[in-house]
Amino acid sequence: MAKLISSPSRVKAEGKLEKIIEEFIGAVNTGTQNVSIALMTSPAGWEEPGQTPEFDEYSVVIRGTLRAEGRDSVTEAGPGQAIFAARGEWVRYSTPGAEGAQYIAVCLPAFTPVTAHRDE
C-alpha cells in the first residue's frame, strides 16, 4: 500500500554557512534505517567538513553546482547530473557557484550523524 509522506523534517546541517536539509524519508522523518532521501538547498560558498561515511550517497543536482572533493579528485555536477560517493571513501561537499545549489541526496543505508564520520 502506498503511503503519503506529507512533509519533510528539517535536519541540522554542518558547515560554515546554513544549508537547509529537508528529509522526506530517513531516520529522522520516518524512522527508516535502510535509506534516506532529502532535498538539500545550500547557499553560494557553503562547504561542510569532510567525512568518511558508512553509506553510499547519490546526489542529483536540480539547480546550481555541487562539488565533491575526494582524496585524489574533484567532481562537479550541474542541473540534470549526479554524483556518486561510495561508502568508506573520504568526501567533502561544497557549493562554489554564485547561485548555490539545490539537490536531492539519497543515502544507502540512511544518513545519521554518527555514521557520517565527519572530520573534526
Question: Where are the language model's segments positioned?
Answer:
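Short beta-strand His + acidic residue motifs that chelate non-heme Fe in jelly-roll/DSBH
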Residues: 48-50, 68-69, 85, 91-98
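Short acidic-glycine-tyrosine-enriched beta hairpin
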Residues: 72-87
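Short, charged/polar surface micro-motifs in flexible loops or helix N-caps
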Residues: 30-33, 43-46, 63-66, 109-113
